Amino acid sequence: GAVFLMLMVGFTINLLTLLAIVLSVGLVVDDAIVMVENVERHIQLGEKPFPAAIKAARELVGPIIAMTITLAAVYLPIGIQGGLTGALFREFAFTLAGAVIISGVVALTLSPMMASKLLREGDHDRGFAGFVNRRFEAFRKTYTRWLTNTLNYRPILFTVWAIVVALIFPFYMFSARELAPKEDQSVVFGVIQASANSTLDQTKLFTKQVYDVYHSFPESQSVFQITSPTGGFGGVVTKPWSERKKSTQQLQVEAAMGFSKIPGLRVISLVPPPLPGGGSFPVDFVIASTAEPQQLSDFANQLVGKAFASGLFMFADSDLKFDQPQAEVVFDRDKLRSQGVDLSKAGQDLSTLLGGNYVNRFSIQGRSYKVIPQIKRAERLTPDQLEGIYVTGKDEKLVPLSTFATLKTTTEPRDLKKFQQLNAVRIQGVIPPGVSLNTALTMLESEAAKILPKGFTVDYAGESRQLRTEGRKFLGTFLLSGILIYLVLAAQFESFRDPFIILAGSVPLALSGALLFPFLGATTINIYSQIGLITLVGLVSKNGILIVEFANKLQEQGRDKVHAVIEAATTRLRPILMTTAATVMGHMPLVFARGPGAGARNSIGITLVSGMIIGSVFTLFFVPAIYVLVARTHKKVESVDENGEKTQPELVEVAV
């Protein structure tokens, strides 16, 4: 169904839509599990399969619709947001939402029909199913005792709830953050930097050693390199993941160690960014001001020194370098006049001899060649050799340049950068494995605040800019998802209290559990784990919906609030555990994924699995406690028989 919807709206099969389909495996079975379990429960109470299926479907129309719309609504803010996240995850979000909606329709139609045909009376007492049911019945009674005792100590329970919720903030603030996990893309790059006045022949003397470092790796499949006079670019394409033992991150570190031994060059080892548009360097920190370039360079060099001293960088440097030697020919106009040399003619002669300009063409054997006059290379290697050049003087006589000109040598920047029409310098860096991009940027921001005077601003470029801009969108998207879910549930329950009970009793606790693992270093806060956190809101809300919906019905049948919620939680214990187990097992392959693309899958898998396990356990105790505190008391509903007499509705008997 999801693939059909993708075809209808023009989505493509790509890594993110495939990830959505993998995630949907653990999501779409939930509604069917709840329906089939409810049919089985009615059969155990003595009803025939067909009436049991009809009754179960009627009971669960509301909860399943609420669960389906809730989970689908979670993905709406993801799909409609702009920027990089919106561009990447639009198809992902709507593919998952479509799969969830289809699963809800199937759960209300196909699932009860199949349950009425395939489930039989007495099956739950025989064989392995009977053994499992007896063990679960014992566990259900134990849970009932635990819940009953827990509700007697609600102040302690609410204190624990407040502590767990408060942990969300330190877990989130002190977790490593990056735009996306580093991925093994089977390539390691090397950026080669030579001195500003280096020639191509000089650079080639050393770039062969760069090639040799890459070629020495057993994991190497092919090596490429492009060399220019002042640097170059190269890299190694590795063998497939199955044919090597080391990741590209490990090879990056080994390559950096090998490059450090090469004289005459500076080679920066790096891996490509995990997302498009990130630029060459993960750290790209911009300082902008109206100040002179030399002052910008001084402050940038101070920050580079702080970066190396912090131990967070494999490489750091600024792109504003005052290392370009420049020789200026200064003419003495008085001497020019005394020797009868025309200034424009002297300049033209110098341009012809040194500039290498095209002046004409000639043909040989039908082929055309350019005429480029220039003195021999050996005679123009150093600025001092300019003094031996002759230019045309009076009466076409040659006059030595040294008789009327002097050389002035200076050092200038290779180039000057602008950022938003201001003079700017960029500090670019590479971080080692185990250090997050946010940690490196935070360090630079902190040091810049101490070093830079007024009139200087900091900004970002490349992957660093993406992290800062996309990272700020998460809280807004998360809040919008929460508001949408609350409004959907409020409309479904016709109450503002019930949605609060559902969300307060499940979502903060699941978020705390999911953020525990980034806090411990098992993963990072990135766009994939953020998508997992938003998905988690819809998933754990399902458990609260089942409990609150059934507790309200039991109150209408005459139960008091405490007994109603205990019976509701006990009755819905099995589907809650089954849906949690299905979701966890469906996402477990993401947790243990290896190879290309494993970083993204690990991140979203760890977030969902940890959040579902911890959130579901807490939900079984905190939702009933908050229900007792917040839920309104529902009056007993009396029905009228065909004679117009009031009758009491039949109570659902559940062994507690």
Where are these regions (language model features)?
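Hydrophobic transmembrane alpha-helices and their membrane-interface caps
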Residues: G1-R41, K48, I80, G98, ...
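Flexible hinge/switch segments at interdomain interfaces of large molecular machines
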Residues: M114-D125, L179-V187, Q225-T230, R266-S289, ...
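Solvent-exposed, membrane-proximal periplasmic/extracellular interface segments of envelope transport
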Residues: F189, D201-G279, V304-G305, D334-G356
